Design a protein with these regions (language model features):
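Activation segment signature within eukaryotic-like protein kinase domains
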Residues: 33-34
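Regulatory extensions flanking the kinase catalytic core
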Residues: 181-216
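Conserved activation segment of eukaryotic-like protein kinases, specifically the C-terminal portion
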Residues: 86-99
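Conserved short submotifs of the Hanks-type protein kinase catalytic core
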Residues: 1-13
Length: 231
C-alpha cells in the first residue's frame, strides 16, 4: 500500500531570500514577518505547551501570496511549568545566553524567552543583510561573543524606525529575566503598527523572485547553521 503525504508548497525561506537580495530586507517586510512569527510562537506556547528552540531565518518561510510561516519542529519540546526540561539540538549562532551558560547549572532550565532572543538575532541578520557574528570562524567563538559582548543592535545609520530598533533591543536583552515574553511583544508598538499597516508582501516577494537568481547551494553549511547540542 502506498502512502502519500500532501504538503503545502512555500516559495522559499528568509535565509535564501537574503542571499537572493544580497542585502537587507526592508523594514516593512520584516514588520509583517515579525508579526506572523511572534503570533506563531505564542500559539505554540499557549495552545500546545511547545517551545520551538530553533528560530532562525532558514525556518521562516514565505510564498507568493505574501504569507509567512514557521517551520521545522524537529527539535521543539514540551514545556513543563513553562520551562523546557529536555536536552535538544540547536544552532549556536541563534542561541540565547541562558542556554549557553545557565545561571544555575544545577537547574539548566529555560523558557520561551530563549526563542525571543533567537528571533532578535534573526531580525538583525535580515535587516542588515549580515549575520552579526559573521567574523567568527567556529561555534566556540560565537558562543564566547554572545556571553561576553553586548548584544548586536540595529545600526541607527541604516534608517530603521525607533520602534523597530526598540523591538530588537528588547528581544536581545541579555538578562532573560528582563527579556519580554510573547504577550508583552504582542503589545509592542512595532507589532501593533504592522498588525494594521497595509504592506504588499506578495508583490514585493514576487518581484524579488523574478529579478534575482536562486542562491547556489554549496557542499557545506555556513558555520552558524551547524547543529550545537546543549540543554
Amino acid at each position: 500500500t502506498d502512502v502519500f503525504i500532501a504538503m503545502e508548497l512555500m516559495g522559499t525561506c528568509a535565509e535564501k531570500l537574503k542571499k537572493r537580495i544580497q542585502g537587507p530586507i526592508p523594514e516593512r517586510i520584516l514588520g509583517k514577518m515579525t508579526v506572523a512569527i511572534v503570533k506563531a510562537l505564542f500559539y505554540l506556547k499557549e495552545k500546545h505547551g511547545v517551545i520551538h528552540r530553533d528560530v532562525k531565518p532558514s525556518n521562516i518561510l514565505l510564498d507568493e501570496r505574501g504569507q509567512v510561516k514557521l517551520c521545522d519542529f524537529g527539535i521543539s519540546g514540551r514545556l513543563v511549568d513553562s520551562k523546557a526540561k529536555t536536552r535538544s539540538a540547536g544552532c549556536a549562532a541563534y542561541m540565547a545566553p541562558e542556554r549557553i551558560d545557565p545561571p544555575d547549572p544545577t537547574k539548566p532550565d529555560y523558557d520561551i524567552r530563549a526563542d525571543v532572543w533567537s528571533l532578535g538575532i534573526s531580525l538583525v541578520e535580515l535587516a542588515t543583510g549580515q549575520f552579526p557574528y559573521q567574523n567568527c570562524k567556529t561555534d566556540f567563538e560565537v558562543l564566547t561573543k554572545v556571553l561576553q559582548e553586548d548584544p548586536p543592535l540595529l545600526p541607527p545609520a541604516m534608517g530603521f524606525s525607533g520602534d523597530f530598533q526598540a523591538f530588537v533591543r528588547d528581544c536581545l536583552t541579555k538578562d532573560h529575566r528582563k527579556r519580554p515574553k510573547y504577550n508583552k511583544l504582542l503589545e509592542h508598538n512595532f507589532i501593533k503598527r504592522y498588525e494594521t499597516l497595509e504592506v504588499d508582501v506578495a508583490t514585493w516577494f514576487k518581484d524579488v523572485m523574478a529579478r534575482t537568481e536562486s542562491p547556489r547551494t554549496g557542499g557545506g553549511l555556513s558555520h552558524h547553521h551547524l547543529p550545537f547540542f546543549t540543554r
